[in-house]
C-alpha cells in the first residue's frame, strides 16, 4: 500500500473486448503527484474526445476529434464524463490499493474451498455518500496461498441479486506494484484488459496540453 501511495504517475488503457474483438478503448494518464488527468476515448456519438483536468476542481480543457472545444458547457460536460470514466476505470484497475480509502467498509465474510484452493472472502461496502455509487457491494476472493485476488463478485447500484462476477487474471508487475491486467466477465463473452500499463516517474508536459499524444 505504501509503495502504491508513493507512485507519482500511472498510465493505462481500459479496453473492452467482446466476442474476441475490441469494442472500446479509454486511455488514461494520471499524474498522481500533481492531481491531474488526461482521459481519451469515444463519447456516446462515437467521436474521440480528450479531457484534461485537475481532480480537485475538475477544471481544464477538452478536445473533440483533435480540435479544442471552446464552448464552456461542452468542456464541462466532457470533463465530467472523463472524471466519471477515471473513477470507474482506475477502480477496476487498482481496487486492491483502495481498500482503506475513507468511506470504505470491509469485513471478513467467510472462507470457501475448492479442490485445490482456499479463499478468504472479503465483503466491501461503502458509507452513504462515498464516491459516485455508494450502494455498490463487492466480494473479493483472496487466494490464501498467493494472497492475490482470483475473482470478485459485485452487486452494483441498481442491480438486483444474484451478484455478477469476473475472474482476475494476468497478475503483472507494473513498476513496484502488481496488478491484474485482465478480467474475464462471468457468463458473458466479455473481457476487460488493462493495456499499456506503466508507472513512469513523470509524463511529458505535452500530455496535458496537446490535442493528441503518443502512448
Model feature map: region roles:
Residues 12, 39, 60, 106, ...:
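Well-ordered beta-strand positions enriched in small/hydrophobic/aromatic, beta-favoring residues
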Residues 24, 50, 64, 69-71, ...:
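A sequence-level detector of short linear motifs
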Residues 19-23, 45-48, 85-86, 131-133, ...:
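Solvent-exposed loop/turn segments connecting transmembrane beta-strands
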Residues 28-34, 55-58, 75-78, 169-172, ...:
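A short, sequence-level motif marking secondary-structure junctions
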Residues 2-68:
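N-terminal mature ectodomain segment of secretory-pathway/periplasmic proteins
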Residues 113-212:
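Gly/Pro-enriched, hydrophobic low-complexity segments
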Residues 57-136, 157-162, 211-215:
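Flexible, processing/modification-adjacent segments and terminal tails
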Amino acid at each position: 500500500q505504501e509503495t502504491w501511495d508513493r507512485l507519482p504517475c500511472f498510465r493505462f488503457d481500459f479496453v473492452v473486448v467482446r466476442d474476441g474483438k475490441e469494442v472500446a478503448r479509454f486511455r488514461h494518464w494520471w499524474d498522481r503527484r500533481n492531481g491531474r488527468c488526461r482521459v481519451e476515448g469515444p463519447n456516446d456519438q462515437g467521436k474521440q474526445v480528450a479531457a484534461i483536468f485537475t481532480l480537485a476542481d475538475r477544471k481544464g480543457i477538452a478536445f473533440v476529434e483533435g480540435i479544442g472545444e471552446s464552448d464552456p458547457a461542452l468542456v464541462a460536460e466532457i470533463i465530467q464524463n472523463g472524471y466519471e470514466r477515471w473513477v470507474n476505470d482506475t477502480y477496476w484497475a487498482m481496487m486492491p490499493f483502495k481498500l482503506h480509502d475513507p468511506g470504505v467498509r470491509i469485513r471478513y465474510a467467510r472462507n470457501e474451498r475448492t479442490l485445490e484452493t482456499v479463499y478468504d472472502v472479503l465483503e466491501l461496502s461503502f458509507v452513504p455518500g462515498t464516491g459516485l455509487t455508494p450502494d455498490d457491494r463487492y466480494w473479493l476472493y483472496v487466494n490464501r496461498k498467493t494472497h492475490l485476488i482470483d475473482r470478485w463478485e459485485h452487486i452494483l447500484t441498481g442491480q438486483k441479486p444474484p451478484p455478477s462476477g469476473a475472474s482476475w487474471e494476468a497478475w503483472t508487475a507494473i513498476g513496484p506494484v502488481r496488478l491484474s491486467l485482465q478480467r474475464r466477465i462471468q457468463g458473458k463473452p466479455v473481457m476487460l484488459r488493462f493495456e499499456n500499463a506503466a508507472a513512469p516517474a513523470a509524463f511529458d508536459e505535452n500530455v496535458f496540453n496537446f490535442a493528441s499524444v503518443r502512448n
